[in-house]
Amino acid sequence: MEGSEEHGETSKAPLSRGVSKGVSILDVILRFVAIIGTLASAIAMGTTNQTLPFFTQFIRFKAQYSDLPTLTFFVVANSIVSAYLILSLPLSIVHVIRSRAKYSRLILIFFDAAMLALVTAGASAAAAIVYLAHKGNARANWLAICQQFDSFCERISGSLIGSFAAMVVLVLLIFLSAIALARR
């Protein structure tokens, strides 16, 4: 009977190692997805501008992301998160090779949570501005600008998608790292 218990324990060890390796590979893939989301959001927002043509050459109306500090914060936040994710890739690849690395997973959980907070702050603040651009605010006499600056509004609205997707991916990365640590 003892021999069968020992055999059962040894047969679970390779399975556990395989699951840990699968979690580590999924971690690398999700980091690539988050990089694409945050980088695309930062680029889309950072290159957004629109000038309205009028009859005279002296009067021009222009909308740029840099006109609003909140959208500038969005670009900076997504750029920082994207840079962090790129720099964390080698550490994530180390987890594929050495799935027993405990302290580096703790470091990744800590920084992933910090980056989740940063991207959430940037995306939430930008979402409020995008809402105001589309709807305006009658009480404050802020008019909606999206009827005039339609291309500008489409791009700033679209850039939010990648950022919110990166938020979901960062939550998944934190859960994956926590699961990998709990299995130890």
Swiss-Prot record:
Query: What is its membrane topology?
Result: Multi-pass membrane protein
Q: Where in the cell is it found?
A: Cell membrane
Q: Which InterPro entries match?
A: CASP/CASPL, CASP_dom, CASPL
- Could you confirm whether the keyword Isomerase appears in this record? no
- The organism's superkingdom is given as Eukaryota
Transmembrane regions listed in the UniProt entry: 25-45, 73-93, 106-126, 160-180
Q: Name one GO cellular component term.
A: plasma membrane
Q: GO:BP terms for this protein? A: cell wall organization
Which segments does the topology annotation call Extracellular? 46-72, 127-159
Residues exposed to the Cytoplasmic side? 1-24, 94-105, 181-184
Keyword terms, alphabetized: Cell membrane, Cell wall biogenesis/degradation, Glycoprotein, Membrane, Transmembrane, Transmembrane helix
According to the record, glycans are attached at 49
Stored Pfam families:
CASP_dom (PF04535)
Family membership noted in the UniProt record: Belongs to the Casparian strip membrane proteins (CASP) family.
**What biological function has been recorded for the protein in this entry?**
Regulates membrane-cell wall junctions and localized cell wall deposition. Required for establishment of the Casparian strip membrane domain (CSD) and the subsequent formation of Casparian strips, a cell wall modification of the root endodermis that determines an apoplastic barrier between the intraorganismal apoplasm and the extraorganismal apoplasm and prevents lateral diffusion.
Question: Quaternary arrangement and interactors, per the entry?
Answer: Homodimer and heterodimers.
Q: Which PANTHER family match?
A: CASP-LIKE PROTEIN, CASP-LIKE PROTEIN 1U1
Q: What is this protein called?
A: Casparian strip membrane protein 3
